[in-house]
Amino acid sequence: MGNNVVVLGTQWGDEGKGKIVDLLTERAKYVVRYQGGHNAGHTLVINGEKTVLHLIPSGILRENVTSIIGNGVVLSPAALMKEMKGLEDRGIPVRERLLLSEACPLILDYHVALDNAREKARGAKAIGTTGRGIGPAYEDKVARRGLRVGDLFDKATFAVKLKEVMEYHNFQLVNFYKVEAVDYQKVLDDVMAIADILTSMVVDVSDLLDQARKRGDFVMFEGAQGTLLDIDHGTYPYVTSSNTTAGGVATGSGLGPRYVDYVLGIIKAYSTRVGAGPFPTELFDDTGEFLCKQGNEYGATTGRRRRTGWLDSVAVRRAVQINSLSGFCLTKLDVLDGLEEVKICVAYRMPDGREVTTTPLAADDWEGIEPIYETMPGWSESTFGVKDRSGLPQAALNYIKRIEELTGVPIDIISTGPDRTETMILRDPFDA
């Protein structure tokens, strides 16, 4: 039996993690976010009602679940308050269900200003960030000048630290990027107005998780973005600024690494990517447009149209290696309904003619890669909302089996629609 279950994306994000976390938290006591920030966009559909979460864990809608934001998350006070208000307006008692690590770095206005100034300065070489200050906040953390939630307990000292760090960043904004400085007093006033709310939710997350482990409580760790956007293992530099992989669970929450019992990789039945960066199987034809429209592939956070393409088993195998995946959850299978044929990338042809079955590590090495496809028959029958494996067309079952063969990982859950009920659980991670 697995008490500590990790749910993470195996591609470039947007795989459908939020729905699966929400579904599996029916048995969980805690749900923990351990990396990223409000650049995530987790969409939940429950009884036809849609909820989009960016910062708060997807367990927040469950009455008996405590949601935790761990130290690996960069926290925007403004974004958190906005999200809390939206949920509280719907009658969800967020403050009774949400806890924070005091070690969470804060995202403040100057981080957002830096993020946008840098993207503008890069011009055609822009990374395609969400412009929400995620990267600059992580930079401050690593440089040991960042302000954290715990600093809000001493407001006078916080004000001094804030002034020092803002002088540093405003110098860059004005003299290098040639944009306006961020107003110190406004930033201070905005944070002080909600400081007591934030500190009232602080808890020692590592100790809480250790006590939960000793009691045998079920804990779900919710990843954001996807493996191929990991700062170390992704398509660098077109990556996010955190460790999106299973290794980030221990460092981003304080759970001992030996205590992760099961890692569930969410894999979309095709591939998508937002923003710039390598994408070998990207489609620019009618099929790519079909996938975009059928899958409603527009970012929950930015609203940007996602790039679409065939499933890339080479890239997914890298995710299998890095995360030591226990099983897959296959999502958006229904989006492929109606296609005469479906393709899976099984290898890459390099510019020098070599065929390889592993992904390059450097972004420049992705240049000129051609995907080598295996083509399979599609299916005309609808898989939307199917809740039993026996109700799937044979061609869809063959597609599922081939994914398992190419990756060496079993598909334990199949999602056939956005609602939490439109799911087949073949093996429950908490029982694995």
From Swiss-Prot:
Its main location: cytoplasm. Keywords: Cytoplasm, GTP-binding, Ligase, Magnesium, Metal-binding, Nucleotide-binding, Purine biosynthesis. Binds 1 Mg(2+) ion per subunit. It is found in: Cytoplasm. One of its GO terms (biological process) is 'de novo' AMP biosynthetic process. Substrate binds at A300, T301, T302, G303, R304, R305, R306. GO terms for molecular function: adenylosuccinate synthase activity; GTP binding; magnesium ion binding. Pathway: Purine metabolism; AMP biosynthesis via de novo pathway; AMP from IMP: step 1/2. Mg(2+) binds at D14, G41. Belongs to the adenylosuccinate synthetase family. HAMAP family: Adenylosucc_synth. Plays an important role in the de novo pathway of purine nucleotide biosynthesis. Catalyzes the first committed step in the biosynthesis of AMP from IMP. This is Adenylosuccinate synthetase. It comes from Citrobacter koseri (strain ATCC BAA-895 / CDC 4225-83 / SGSC4696). The gene is purA.
